Amino acid sequence: MPASFVSDPARRVEIARTILSQLPEWFGIPAATEEYITDAAREPCFVYEKDGAPVGFLCLKETGHSTVELAVMGVLKSCHRKGYGRALVDAAAAYARQMGYEFMQVKTVQMGKYEEYDRTNRFYLSCGFKEFEVFPTLWDDWNPCQIYVLSLNK
């Protein structure tokens, strides 16, 4: 089943809150998590549902005329490694291409710092993202920011 676009802003917020509240390993800073949730009302978002319930979502944010950022993504831990995350990335990339974007970027904690984020890094690499740049202190000294980029030109 493919991921689907969520047009209703209130539904996007509800989905973001439901998923992110269950992922404290990745979204453990309450103020930052709340910002992701409120931003979902204004951003293009996609959901993956299983048996009628959301198990994953992804929101995009424009960062330049040619580039869109995968601003936030979450998939319930019990649903990892089942293809739902890839379906979300594929749907978002197709949408971004249709909207005329050439690149998609994503930020995460650099590989080698935390096992949870190492899995996240490997996921993005498996989706075709390429390492672009690391900002060692963008977030703080303990969480170097790795930027990956995906070419949307096929």
Residue ranges and their predicted role:
Residues 47, 53-61, 67-74:
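Conserved beta-strand in the GNAT
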Residues 43, 143-148:
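Short hydrophobic/aromatic beta-strand or adjacent loop that forms the aromatic wall/cage
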Residues 115-120, 134-144:
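Short glycine/proline-centered loop/turn elements that form peptide/ligand docking sites
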Residues 66-77, 86, 105-107:
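Conserved acetyl-CoA binding element of GNAT-fold acetyltransferases
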Residues 79, 83-91:
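Conserved acetyl-CoA pyrophosphate-binding loop and the N-cap/start of the following alpha-helix
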Residues 96-116:
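Conserved GNAT acetyl-CoA-binding A-motif
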Residues 1-31:
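Short amphipathic alpha-helix that is part of the acyltransferase structural core
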Residues 124, 129:
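Conserved active-site tyrosine of GNAT-family acetyltransferases
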